[in-house]
Design a protein with these regions (language model features):
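Short, intrinsically disordered, charge-balanced linker/junction segments flanking boundaries
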Residues: 1, 172, 177-181
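Extracellular beta-strand-rich solenoid/capping regions of secreted or surface-exposed proteins
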Residues: 2-14, 24-68, 73-100, 127-129, ...
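Compositionally biased regions
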Residues: 3, 90, 95, 106, ...
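Right-handed parallel beta-helix
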Residues: 17, 64-76, 98-115, 133-145, ...
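Beta-rich catalytic cores
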Residues: 54, 87, 123, 149, ...
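Flexible, solvent-exposed loop segments that connect beta-strands
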Residues: 80-85, 116-121, 176
C-alpha cells in the first residue's frame, strides 16, 4: 500500500492532540490545542510542501474513529499511487456505509495535494469520501489543491456523506471543474 500514511481498520475511541511534549503521568486534562500543536504530516522528503516523495495521511477502511485537536498537513497522492479504493492525499474514507465513520473536532487540514488526473479518483485533497461518513466540527480546510473535482472535499458516491459544522474553507483550489470547496 505505497504512498499511504496511517490506515484505520478498526474502531479507535479517540486520538487527541494538544499535549505538551513534556507531559508526564496519566493526567490527560492538561490539553491546549493552540499552544501544543499536534501534527500528522505526509512530508516524507522534508521540504515543507506536498509533492512527489510524500504520502497520503489517513485512510479509514472500517470502524469508527474520533480525532480532536490535530493538524493534518502536506498529504500528497500521485496518479501512480492512486487506486480505485485508495486515492486520497489528506483523509480518505473508503469502507462500508454503515460501519465506517470519522469525526474530526477542532482540527486543521492544510496544504494537501491530489495530483491524480483520472476523473473517478481526482479531487478532495483534504477529505475524499468514497463510502462512509465524515463529521467535521470546527475544522479548518486551508490551501489544499487538486487537478479537478473539489479543491478541498469530494463525496464520490451515493453512500458518501459529509456533515460540516462551523468549518472554514479558505484558499482551496483546483485546475478543472466541479467546485473549489
Amino acid at each position: 500500500e505505497s504512498g499511504l500514511g496511517v490506515i484505520v481498520r478498526k474502531n479507535v475511541k479517540a486520538i487527541k492532540g494538544g499535549y505538551s511534549q513534556f507531559s508526564e503521568g496519566t493526567d490527560v486534562s492538561a490539553r491546549d490545542i493552540d499552544a501544543y500543536v499536534t501534527v500528522i504530516s505526509g512530508d516524507v522528503n522534508g521540504n515543507k510542501q506536498a509533492d512527489a516523495g510524500d504520502c497520503g495521511l489517513l485512510l479509514v477502511k472500517k470502524g469508527h474513529i474520533a480525532i480532536e485537536g490535530v493538524t493534518f498537513q502536506y498529504g500528497y497522492v500521485s496518479e501512480a499511487d492512486a487506486s480505485t479504493t485508495e486515492c486520497g492525499s489528506g483523509i480518505y474514507v473508503s469502507g462500508g456505509a454503515g460501519d465506517t465513520s470519522i469525526e474530526l473536532t477542532d482540527c486543521v487540514i492544510r496544504d494537501c495535494t491530489s495530483a491524480v488526473t483520472t476523473s473517478a479518483k481526482q479531487g478532495g485533497p483534504a477529505v475524499f469520501v468514497l463510502s462512509g461518513q465524515v463529521r467535521l466540527n470546527k475544522v479548518n480546510l486551508l490551501d489544499n489543491k487538486a487537478v479537478g473535482r473539489g479543491g478541498a472535499v469530494r463525496c464520490s458516491s451515493k453512500t458518501a456523506v459529509v456533515f460540516m459544522n462551523g468549518c472554514l474553507l479558505k484558499g482551496n483550489s483546483h485546475n478543472g471543474s466541479w467546485g473549489n470547496g
